[in-house]
Amino acid sequence: ITLSGGEVMSQDMDYIEQLCKTLYNKGYSVNIDTCGYAPYEDFKRILPYVNTFLYDIKAMDKATHEKFIGVDNELILENLKKLSADGARINIRIPTVMGVNATEEFMMDVVNFLKENSISVAQVNLLPYHNTGKHKYSKLDRDYDTEGLMEKPSNESMELFKNIFVKNGFNNTKIGG
């Protein structure tokens, strides 16, 4: 069972902890999909009951992260290091977006961060951007103005990015979730 949607770690942690504990104790595999932006104490509360953290990395430098996400990434990266040190099973998920992070340089920055900090990674998922929700904007009478910015990387680029991880020892790297 994967807790996802919105940000799980920003919900009522008493409820989330009890839900994870109940599911885990009933034998379910519990996964948490997170951006990592939460107090580490909240992660510690649920760590014993979570099988896998699906952990997003969207940008490696503070300025880019703040520009596109709205907050810097210091807490996110620190929490990732702590989760790994505490023995959590982690799948790194990289939403890959042209104009934001779909570059060889960014992928190498992620590889270097993971290696330099001895982050234990079970799997890397490169998630190509999609505009599946584009039609919802018209229903809200809003423009979907992302021309030239928020676009899906080519299949060739995604394969190149995957190979960067594989060549650096992250053999369980996949395109898609």
Mark where each language-model region is.
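Conserved AdoMet/S-adenosylmethionine-binding subsite of the radical SAM
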Residues: 2, 9-138
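A structural motif corresponding to the C-terminal lobe/cap of the Radical SAM core domain
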Residues: 115, 122, 137-164
